[in-house]
Amino acid sequence: MSEPRQILVTSALPYANGSIHLGHMLEYIQTDMWVRFQKLRGNQCVYVCADDAHGSAIMLRAEKEGITPEQLIANVQAEHSSDFADFLVDFDNFHSTHSEENRELSGLIYTRLRDAGHIATRSVTQYFDPEKGMFLADRFIKGTCPKCAAEDQYGDNCEKCGATYAPTELKNPKSAISGATPVLRDSQHFFFKLPDFQAMLQQWTRSGTLQDAVANKLAEWLDSGLQEWDISRDAPYFGFEIPGEPGKYFYVWLDAPIGYMASFKNLCARRPELDFDAFWSEGSKAELYHFIGKDIVNFHALFWPAMLEGSGFRKPTAVNVHGYLTVNGAKMSKSRGTFIKARTYLDHLQPEYLRYYYAAKLGRGVDDLDLNLEDFVQKVNSDLVGKVVNIASRCAGFIHKGNDGVMVAGDAAPDLTEAFLAAAPSIAEAYESRDFGRAMREIMALADRANAWIADKAPWSLAKQEGKQEEVQAICAQGINLFRQLVIFLKPVLPLLAADAEAFLNVAPLTWNDHLSRLENHKLNPFKALMSRIEPAKVEAMIAASKEDLLAAEAKAPAGNGELTKDPLSAEIEFDTFAAVDLRVALIVKAEAVPGADKLLQLTLDIGDERRNVFSGIKSAYPDPSKLEGRLTMMVANLKPRKMRFGVSEGMVMAAGPGGEEIYLLSPDSGAKPGQRIK
């Protein structure tokens, strides 16, 4: 028998600035299923992760909430840990990048790279927010992508085309913090000489470490020539200060992947059988796998292996990349209630429903996965309740009633037993290659055969016939053994169901090799329902709750749209000054263009007991003035009449907006009457 494999597995680090949602959970569930399969096979498989806890976003959010960054990341880590645990994601260690292990390793890798000549320093022209008084990190600049012209993209990479670029390459930049137009200032920065590793990366990315589609995408970047990577940020910044460089900090993407190493090192201190160097030293025989989303491929498949190579550590065995999650065929939407937080899901549905559905749809590629909620309900109910659990519920009662819960010896269906045994290697290969969808299809095909065989034998009918009790017991014992096989095959996906089934079967925790054996002359525990059907009403309630989450978040947070920066609040006034302005509801009786005036409309306003003539510069936003007629608006009624070239204007209507087409005439709520005072 071969020696157990030594395997270290990571998932991408969730950012410590927000809640986990179902899109995130796709990756952690996928990774957890693969890890559980390896452990089920008897391999030494260690699964580590951490919160990504550095960067300007965390610093600014903590400032906004009036707490320290350390308090913020501690709060978020507690929330993340709870969500992962309740989704049955079983990390061996869930750490934080804001740790002493990560500080030490980041400093070590940097100094090794520096001493080997892989770090350059030079002055860069960098964006500075004059309103906030700080240099802007890449994620706090937004503008138009210089590669594909997609708007509203971040300052370091484009979410549409995947390109990376310097913030100064971004077109039409704006500060995402204040809305101000940033100004350019010079600053001394530190660069990782990524081009030093061009040849190594061209070979490594084509060595089977990546899916073909990912390697092909990386080839585009490699063929165009790699650029030096800016790894420093200026104070103020929440992160690790670069050794020997006061006021300069490591860019979050430098120390984030080092967080994998730090989390493992933290675990090694508590698990003496684990040796850090055995997994991370150059020439290590252990296997190292990263599971990530396709949006961060460049960091994990270019920068990260180059950093490891240059600092004397081993490179990953493979980087496994998955696509995004869509819901009902579209991008997750807060307004439609399909942007579903992990906790919102858990408040309404069992975690294993989603674990199974993800498994059933996950392949080896990088295609997006669609969570179709109607199909989700149908598939879980049909496969798990209608097929797998149904076998045990059909057979258990007859064994308890007819033989005091003891399974008889013998094999009532040798051909079926052989088919289940023969399927195991293919199912194992599907798990190993992360082709979870194929594994689920093959498992459910076995469940279909088992159910068809039981239905054909119909023990419920035989139980009513004299002299058929031995046959009933043989059929049901066979059914329970087939159910046990299915539980073993599904255990990486459904650990809770497996644990409940093990309790019913009265057996120790099952391993993969247990599929080679049978239960005979074995006492079962009383059967209890192992899984209930999904009620569509619970899915609808989850969607409604997700919409409520959005409304609650909007109620708590200011718009943050930078309007007050562009047009600051005026100086305070006394109440009497405000009270001197007579605001009234007005009905627009007539609205027409003014001949010879480019911007003006002439409005006839009814304010209850009299009519007013008002000229207003809103023509650019209302090219068809007749559409304003019959509409209520608000006006300043005691403004001194003003003589104009086109006539006398007897007041002013109220509108918002910067001008041009963006002028928005204000209206009172329904029920207001012309002439009523606004107060």
Curated annotation (Swiss-Prot):
<dbReference type="GO" id="GO:0046872">
    <property type="term" value="F:metal ion binding"/>
</dbReference>
<feature type="binding site">
    <location>
        <position position="158"/>
    </location>
    <ligand>
        <name>Zn(2+)</name>
    </ligand>
</feature>
<protein>
    <recommendedName>
        <fullName>Methionine--tRNA ligase</fullName>
        <ecNumber>6.1.1.10</ecNumber>
    </recommendedName>
</protein>
<dbReference type="InterPro" id="IPR004495">
    <property type="entry name" value="Met-tRNA-synth_bsu_C"/>
</dbReference>
<feature type="domain" description="tRNA-binding">
    <location>
        <begin position="577"/>
        <end position="679"/>
    </location>
</feature>
<dbReference type="GO" id="GO:0005829">
    <property type="term" value="C:cytosol"/>
</dbReference>
<keyword id="KW-0030">Aminoacyl-tRNA synthetase</keyword>
<dbReference type="InterPro" id="IPR014758">
    <property type="entry name" value="Met-tRNA_synth"/>
</dbReference>
<keyword id="KW-0862">Zinc</keyword>
<comment type="subunit">
    <text>Homodimer.</text>
</comment>
<dbReference type="GO" id="GO:0000049">
    <property type="term" value="F:tRNA binding"/>
</dbReference>
<dbReference type="Pfam" id="PF09334">
    <property type="entry name" value="tRNA-synt_1g"/>
</dbReference>
<keyword id="KW-0067">ATP-binding</keyword>
<dbReference type="GO" id="GO:0006431">
    <property type="term" value="P:methionyl-tRNA aminoacylation"/>
</dbReference>
<dbReference type="InterPro" id="IPR041872">
    <property type="entry name" value="Anticodon_Met"/>
</dbReference>
<dbReference type="Pfam" id="PF01588">
    <property type="entry name" value="tRNA_bind"/>
</dbReference>
<comment type="similarity">
    <text>Belongs to the class-I aminoacyl-tRNA synthetase family. MetG type 1 subfamily.</text>
</comment>
<feature type="binding site">
    <location>
        <position position="145"/>
    </location>
    <ligand>
        <name>Zn(2+)</name>
    </ligand>
</feature>
<keyword id="KW-0694">RNA-binding</keyword>
<feature type="binding site">
    <location>
        <position position="161"/>
    </location>
    <ligand>
        <name>Zn(2+)</name>
    </ligand>
</feature>
<dbReference type="InterPro" id="IPR033911">
    <property type="entry name" value="MetRS_core"/>
</dbReference>
<keyword id="KW-0547">Nucleotide-binding</keyword>
<feature type="binding site">
    <location>
        <position position="334"/>
    </location>
    <ligand>
        <name>ATP</name>
    </ligand>
</feature>
<dbReference type="InterPro" id="IPR015413">
    <property type="entry name" value="Methionyl/Leucyl_tRNA_Synth"/>
</dbReference>
<dbReference type="InterPro" id="IPR029038">
    <property type="entry name" value="MetRS_Zn"/>
</dbReference>
<dbReference type="InterPro" id="IPR012340">
    <property type="entry name" value="NA-bd_OB-fold"/>
</dbReference>
<feature type="short sequence motif" description="'KMSKS' region">
    <location>
        <begin position="331"/>
        <end position="335"/>
    </location>
</feature>
<feature type="short sequence motif" description="'HIGH' region">
    <location>
        <begin position="14"/>
        <end position="24"/>
    </location>
</feature>
<keyword id="KW-0963">Cytoplasm</keyword>
<comment type="function">
    <text>Is required not only for elongation of protein synthesis but also for the initiation of all mRNA translation through initiator tRNA(fMet) aminoacylation.</text>
</comment>
<dbReference type="GO" id="GO:0005524">
    <property type="term" value="F:ATP binding"/>
</dbReference>
<keyword id="KW-0436">Ligase</keyword>
<dbReference type="Pfam" id="PF19303">
    <property type="entry name" value="Anticodon_3"/>
</dbReference>
<dbReference type="InterPro" id="IPR014729">
    <property type="entry name" value="Rossmann-like_a/b/a_fold"/>
</dbReference>
<keyword id="KW-0820">tRNA-binding</keyword>
<dbReference type="GO" id="GO:0004825">
    <property type="term" value="F:methionine-tRNA ligase activity"/>
</dbReference>
<dbReference type="InterPro" id="IPR001412">
    <property type="entry name" value="aa-tRNA-synth_I_CS"/>
</dbReference>
<feature type="binding site">
    <location>
        <position position="148"/>
    </location>
    <ligand>
        <name>Zn(2+)</name>
    </ligand>
</feature>
<dbReference type="InterPro" id="IPR009080">
    <property type="entry name" value="tRNAsynth_Ia_anticodon-bd"/>
</dbReference>
<keyword id="KW-0648">Protein biosynthesis</keyword>
<dbReference type="InterPro" id="IPR023458">
    <property type="entry name" value="Met-tRNA_ligase_1"/>
</dbReference>
<dbReference type="InterPro" id="IPR002547">
    <property type="entry name" value="tRNA-bd_dom"/>
</dbReference>
